[in-house]
Every structure is written in structure tokens, then in C-alpha cells.
Amino acid sequence: MVAIPNIKIKFGPQGSVRTFQTLSDSSKKIEHVVTEDLSQSSEKSKKRGGPKELDEVQPKKKQRLDCDWSSQCLALLRFLMEHRGGWLFKEPVDPVKMEIPDYFNVIQKPMDLGTVKSKLLKNVYSNADEFAADVRLTFANAMHYNPLWNEVHTIAKEINEIFEVRWESLMKKKVLRLSWNEVREGYKRQPVERDCSRRSSTGTSASSGVGLTKPAKENSEKGSLSSKPVKVQSKKNTPAVTPKALATCKCGRIICICLKSCSSFGSDVCSLTDCQLKNISGAQASELDPQSNGSDTSKKERNGSLKSQLDKPSNSDLLGNELKTAFPALPPVPPEKALRAAILKAQYAGTIIKAKHRIVLGQNNKADLIRIQIEKEQMERAQREEKARIEAEMRAAKVAERMRAQDELKQKRESQRLEIAKMKKGFDFERNNHSKLKKKFVKVCGCFSLTKARLLLEELGLVLKNDYCPELEVIGSEKFDAMRMDDLEEGEIL
């Protein structure tokens, strides 16, 4: 055995590179053998293929339909199956049972709603378009096999139209949801650094004095940091500020990062406010920079342009006014539901407070426990007051309803009384009594004989009709019979 001193082998893309001291012939032979082995192993690895080739050979994982879309598709499918003619498409077509032996000759790809439902439950579909294609194929087969005058053809056409309308509405909702998610995610990637402390005149003078003492290097570093999306600032870079300036900040810090959640129709507002904030911060940095080349007039012009930009009505105000006018006011909540909500809020006050703070409090932190207890008591007190107010409103509503019912009953009784009075006035039984009328007639005419009464009335210029005097008709008929008796001959029968 021959020892090989200080051998160094480096592996590269072209093979192995050797660096070692000059050796004897035997050591050179060993070197040649080692290099040949390394070259052979590299060639074999190239023939077998690298990790990229292995990745290409491995099959990609098939995508599946997400839960939200599958639930919406399942609800739409159930709606179609519950249609008055949906039972025709629930099961696959049986040519033997329906006595249609040529069905599979006409229809090459049979499909039904039951099969679509089973595939949907087994999560076979990779996207929603496959589901829609199977549903359309079901109704297309029915319309293709059955003629136009067949009832199955008309029902399939009707259900297919319903499906197309509902599917179009689902696709519109999906597009709106995707656009909203993209806007929200894109805005979350660009957090905006905003100055939360609105300093007073004294605070601004103190902070500007401190900033002027710092070198230009720190100002350049601050400018580079402000241009990038910063999430946390170190304590070394924060300038010293007077207590008055600190008191004006609500969150207790000089600069905080506010991530504004941007809605689907508020993205323009967000971009506009970001540009205004960047312009203001750039103007302040240029004013604080001691090495900036510019006169006082240029600074005044810049400040005037900034003020004019801020004084102009922004798109946020316009959009806010549009939103106020576009959405109508919500209807008032019934007292029963409001009382139920107040009771539930009072019952779960502790849970609501924990959810607002989003932390799990420990037993050792007494300050937080006391603060949470105070907030819980305040919430319970507010809920009790709201509950009492709602109960008082309910009692007042019940009293008002009772009074309204009594008023309606009184009005109904009064209307009935007036109707009875009108009916009694229209026909009074006491005044229209037959005996009283007879007595008055005798008193006026002097007798109750119809003949004398008729003569008296004729003298007064009044004539009674035959309808109102049946006795006169009888007398007239008797006269007519007597006249006919005179005209009769012997032996003639009347």
C-alpha cells in the first residue's frame, strides 16, 4: 500500500479537479484511477437524469374543487332536481325498462343528474366548468333524443334555461369575490407608514430643532427606510420628542404603521391618500434637510401647492357621499328581537370582551384582569339599561295597541248604531201602522167606502191606478159578464 499525501478533489460541472503534490509513478497511477472513477460516476448520473428530470417525470397533483364552490354547485343541483320535471333526470336512462333499444346508438355519452351528484360528493371535478358541462350534457341528450313536441324535450329545455340563468349569476359572484380578494391581498403587501401624532405648534418646533442637529447621513437613511414597506422601527432611529408632542399621540408612539383595509370600491381612495401622505412626508423631509438647495419662496410655493391639494374635494369624500345615498337605511328591528339580542349580549359579556382584545389573559397579570373586569361591568350595566329601555318600549307599544283596539271597537259600534238609526228612520212601524192609516183616511174622507173615496179624489184632481184598487177591477169584471149575458142566445153556454 502506498499512502497518498495531501490529495484535494474539487467537484465541478465539467468533472473533478485534482490538486496535490508531485508524487511518484505509483501515486500517479492511483491518481489516474481515481479520476477515471469520478468521471464514470458523473457520466452515469448525467445519463440517469438530474433532479429536474425527476420532477418532470413525477405526475402533478390533480386540482380539486374547493368546498365553497362544491356546496354552491350542490345547492344548484338540488334545486334542479326538485323541479316539477326534475325526477326524469335523477337516474340513468334504462333502455330495457323504457323500451327504447336505440338509445345508446343515438346518445354516445349518457349523463344524468344523479351521476353528477355522486361525482360532486366524491370530489371528482377539478373545476366548476366540468360540473356545468355534465349538467348541460344531461339536458342536451334529452333534447337530442326526444322530438320537439315531446313533453320531455320541453321540460329539459325549461330546466336548462333555469340552470343557465343561475349559473351566470354564480359566475358573476365568483368574479366579484376574486377581484375583491386580489385587491385586498395586493394592498396588504404595501403597508403605509403614517404619522399618528398630530403635534401642536410647540411640539413641532421642538421636534424640528432636534431633527436639525442630526447629520445628513441619518436623514438619507430615514428616506431610504421610509420608501420601503417598514413594519417595525428600532428605538435608536426614533428622535427625542417633548412630553407635549407625546401627549398628542393616541397610541403612545410617535410613528405607527396603519394598515388600512381597502374595500372593492375603495381602492382608488387608498391610492389617493397614499400619494398625498408621500408628498407631505417628502416636503417635510426637504424642509428639515439643512443641505437642501432652495430659497424660502420655493418652500412657500411647495406648501401652497400641498394645501391646495388637500383643500380639493378628494375621491374619498365623493365616494362616501355616494355610499350614503346608494344604500338605503336598514328597517327597524322588532322589539322582541332587540330584547333577545340585549339578553344574549349581557349573558356573554366576558366572551365578547375577550374576543375584542384577542388575547388569553393569565392569572398573574392583575392589571389586565382588573381592567377587563371593569369593562365587563360597564358592558353589563349598559346591557341592563338597554334591556330596561326595550322592555319599557314594549310595554308602551302594548298599551298603545290596546288603546287602538278600544278606539276601533268604539268606532265600529258607533257605525252600527248609525246604520240602525237610518234603517228605523226609513221605515217606522209605528207611523206606518194599518189601523192608524185607516182612521186618518176616515177622518179626511168621512167614510171608508172606495167609491166615495174615488169620487172625492177625482174632484181633487187625483186618480188612483187600477193596480192600487183591486176592488174596482172586480166591479169592472162583473159589469163585463153582465153585458155578455145580455148578448147570449138561448141554448148558448157561457
Swiss-Prot record:
Ranges of compositional bias, category Basic and acidic residues: 50-61
Domain of life where this protein originates: Eukaryota
Annotated localization: Nucleus
Annotated region described as Disordered, given as residue ranges: 33-61, 191-237, 286-318
Keyword line: Bromodomain, Coiled coil, Nucleus, Transcription, Transcription regulation
Segments forming a coiled coil: 366-428
GO cellular component: nucleus
One of the Pfam families matching this protein, by short name: Bromodomain
Low complexity bias (residue ranges): 199-209
Domain Bromo: 64-170
Bias (Polar residues): 286-296, 305-318
PROSITE patterns xrefs: BROMODOMAIN_2
Annotated protein name in UniProt: Transcription factor GTE12
UniProt source species: Arabidopsis thaliana
This protein's encoding gene: GTE12
